[in-house]
């Protein structure tokens, strides 16, 4: 089992109870916060710092759907970020070009409303992709899940570019 799932005592699956994850994170972070070990030995202080770092990393992994999917794939021996998973279907490549063109047009026109609409469109695509990932994991279609993770990474990056272009 993945260390991230183990730390939070969660079953390794794509869908997680995000409220439970957040509650457990806060409880564990409070339990192992380095300030609680200020009077402890140097070894115990170092252990607390290391545990806090591990908790933060595990929480980052499990709180983001694509990172969680990549972790599940890693458990199957599949690196979702490997080059063989970068071949996208032609339709997705065309959609990427259309989104980039729409972003450039919106930037050139300083059209924040157009950027917001583009961001909303891509957010809807992300939600559809998360639904596909659920299906791929349920059917144990790990190669398709890896492709979907790569597509999702593009969507994340595109939304970051939109926010940057919009000034936020």
Predicted regions and their residues:
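C-terminal accessory/regulatory regions appended to core domains
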Residues: 1-168
């Amino acid at each position: 089992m993945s260390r991230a799932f183990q730390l939070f005592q969660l079953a390794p699956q794509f869908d997680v109870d995000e409220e439970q994850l957040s509650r457990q994170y806060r409880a564990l972070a409070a339990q192992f916060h380095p300030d609680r070990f200020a009077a402890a030995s140097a070894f115990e202080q170092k252990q607390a710092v290391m545990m806090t770092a591990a908790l933060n990393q595990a929480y980052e992994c499990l709180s983001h759907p694509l990172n969680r999917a990549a972790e599940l794939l890693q458990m199957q021996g599949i690196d979702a970020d490997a080059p063989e998973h970068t071949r996208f279907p032609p339709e997705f490549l065309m959609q990427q070009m259309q989104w980039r063109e729409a972003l450039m047009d919106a930037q050139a026109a300083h059209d924040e409303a157009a950027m917001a609409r583009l961001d909303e469109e891509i957010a809807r695509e992300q939600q559809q992709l998360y639904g596909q990932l659920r299906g791929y994991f349920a059917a144990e279609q790990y190669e398709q899940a890896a492709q979907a993770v790569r597509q999702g990474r593009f969507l994340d990056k595109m939304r970051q570019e939109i926010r940057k272009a919009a000034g936020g």
